[in-house]
Amino acid sequence: MEDLDALWERYREAVRAGGNPQALYQEMVWPALLALWREKPRVYPFPQAFAVSVHTLGTSPEATALAILGAGAERVYVLHTPESARFLPRLRQDTGKDLYPVEIGKSDVEAIYREVKRLLEKHPEVPVALDLTSGTKAMSAGLAAAGFFFQRFYPKVRVVYVDNEDYDPELRRPRAGTEKLRILPNPHEALAEVDALFAKELYGKGEFGQAAAYFRGMVGRTGNQAYALYALLAEMYRAWRALDFGEALKAGRKLLGQLSQNVWLNHPLNARREALEAQVALLEAVDRFLKARDFALKEGVYGLARTLLHLAQEAKEEAAVLAALYAYRALELLLQERLALLGRRAEAPGLSPEEAEALRKALAELLGVLPEEVRLPAKLGLLDLLAFLRLKGDEALGRLSLAELRGLAGALKGRNSALLVHGFDVPSPKAVEGIARLAQGLLQDLEARTALGPLSPEPVPLGF
């Protein structure tokens, strides 16, 4: 450092005497500074072993040379403009490195994005340094933006630049010997709030498993246990959407328990406590019903059918076959609950001869066939249930006109031919909509007969 200080003062005096600043710098200062960095580059916070480095090159090749030496990568890519290409031979000479030049326009940010993506795909598993020291503002900004984005998918990427501790305003240069390569921390690791935005985005899209993973990772990186509560919330909705009611209930109960602790009374999720308690109560009701398989537990039937109809609505655009299955099953549960009010079960309805004959006639009317062509199954299907309940005076179903019922008959009878059941058919959106509409009407009737009130599986807002 003493030698460089002395050189710097002699350089200053030579410039004051009227010498050319650039030529004098190259003659007096640069060889000593370059020799120092070739031997031991100054890197903050500490030297790291990069396998690949990518540099933007403008009209300051000295800074780029220091960045190449500081990164120490075996493979060096240089993004240059047509104007800065003239510095490539000098960079090779100063660094002793083989360079892989890539020409781009000085304002072509999209080209930088494409090149960084290409290079990271080519070197996916190794540490990569992205150096934005030199080049135009557009080039540096583009490389920084690319680095921030791709660090989400390539965590070994680091953004670096050559900084200095002392700038000489008279000579309008960083004071030689004060330069250092600064390696910026990955913001996705250093700043949990960045990942909180990603987690929030995933949560809003219904990607609850991925959101939970982000929240758990943030706990590990920051030590802030508040994110663990968000992870529990996302995990509850993930399990709920997967129809794993036991796991959803477990996560929901644990979440409410933690929100009750003094340390979390001011947690943003406590502002949604009433809605959360109602959702956990719904999960408890469904869990009891699934374990007991007793249609007298109407709150559980309601919760399960409500969930299935919600999933049908979510899936109708992207997965019509799944939407149909959800809607079919929701309607079946609601019809079975109404049948249970009569003391009957679909799998063993115990029809009297008179009831069987009346049901044949009702089905024949709906299907437009002769009664003798109707075969009654041992277990009542969807259309059989609907027709039988109407015969027994079910008020909600009795309000449906014969035309409406005939419109539904084909869709109800076609359940077993659906692609994910026993057949090859994909139910039409119109058929699914009709089934869901009928189920929704029965759900509202059941809702009025439960103590739960209107509830929604919709995720509560995160509060940030």
Swiss-Prot record:
InterPro entries given in the database record: Csm6_6H (IPR054008)
Effect annotated for changing residue 415 to A: No ssRNase activity
Any Gene Ontology biological process: defense response to virus
UniProt KW Metal-binding keyword: no
Entry's family note: Belongs to the CRISPR-associated Csm6 family.
Complex and partners: Homodimer. The protein forms a twisted, head-to-head dimer; the composite ssRNase active site is formed at the dimer interface.
UniProt miscellaneous comment: Probably encoded in a type III-A CRISPR locus.
Name used for this protein in its record: CRISPR system endoribonuclease Csm6
Organism for this UniProt entry: Thermus thermophilus (strain ATCC 27634 / DSM 579 / HB8)
